Amino acid sequence: MAKKGHIHMESGEIINFELFPNEAPNTAANFEELANSGFYNDVTFHRVIPGFVSQGGDPTGTGAGGSGKTIKCETEGNPHKHQAGSLSMAHAGKDTGSSQFFIVHDPQPHLDGVHTVFGQVDKAGVEIARAMKNGDKMTKVHVFDEE
């Protein structure tokens, strides 16, 4: 059974994604819990760097906030690389991930083994992420099981 989801944007656009619960079980579960509890509702992408990433998930919108709990990195044995569309967990240092995540615009091999890739957005979602501006808002994020 696959874990899939949607990020609904204030613009009306929808970013579709799939999670990698086998390769990054704790990170995927943390994201699913936050998404389905409404944590990401009305939260912005506060850091958008063209050609690099669109980062969101901080309820303060400053880049300094989180969910109040941290999770360990799941980079060891994780075969997923930071390619266009990768969903990856942001952190302030090893094992400090919380709620902030980013969508990769173009391959970023220097992030491999440093940040946990826990999902992948589809091609249309990559284009939405590439077109984002700082402050673009998610209205709802949800994760579901798909057979």
PLM regions and their residue ranges:
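Cyclophilin-like peptidyl-prolyl cis-trans isomerases
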Residues: 1-147
